[in-house]
Amino acid sequence: MLAMSDFCTQHPLFSYAVAIVVLLAAMLGLGAVSGTRRVGAARGRSMDLPFESGVLPVGSAHLRIPVQYYLVAMLFVIFDVESVFLFSWAPVAVGAGWRGYGAVVVFVASLAAALAYVWRWGALDWGPVPRRRIDYRRAGDASCAGR
């Protein structure tokens, strides 16, 4: 006859399944005991909605997200990957010599050029483009003739 410890060592999958069932039962039981009870005034329209805190929703859920969020997210991912390359180069910097240093200088220069291009392109600008104010006193009488 097998002892319980021998059975567990010979059938680890069964022990694993029993442990999962026990943990699931414990979590469901604790959730049922400690969960909120919807009784009386607490049970209403706001408690039946799938929103956090039971707060009634206001407005539409279909909001347009500005493109700037996506641009900044893409730029973050690009520069984050490039920083990983630099951090992986740092431990071998001394062993790489001047040739490795030159390669990293070219790499960082191309990063700086890309950042300058993106900045000049306006991908890092937030909000609407400011309008230029026309100073009619400096423009002369010709620009004010139509007024």
From Swiss-Prot:
It is an enzyme of class 7 (translocase). Keywords: Cell inner membrane, Cell membrane, Membrane, NAD, Quinone, Translocase, Transmembrane, Transmembrane helix, Transport, Ubiquinone. Its EC number is 7.1.1.-. One of its GO terms (cellular component) is NADH dehydrogenase complex. Pfam families: Oxidored_q4 (PF00507). It catalyses: a quinone + NADH + 5 H(+)(in) = a quinol + NAD(+) + 4 H(+)(out). It is found in: Cell inner membrane. It is a multi-pass membrane protein. The chain crosses the membrane at residues 13-33, 70-90, 104-124. NDH-1 is composed of 14 different subunits. Subunits NuoA, H, J, K, L, M, N constitute the membrane sector of the complex. HAMAP family: NDH1_NuoA. This is NADH-quinone oxidoreductase subunit A. The lineage of its organism: Bacteria, Pseudomonadati, Pseudomonadota, Alphaproteobacteria, Acetobacterales. The gene is nuoA.
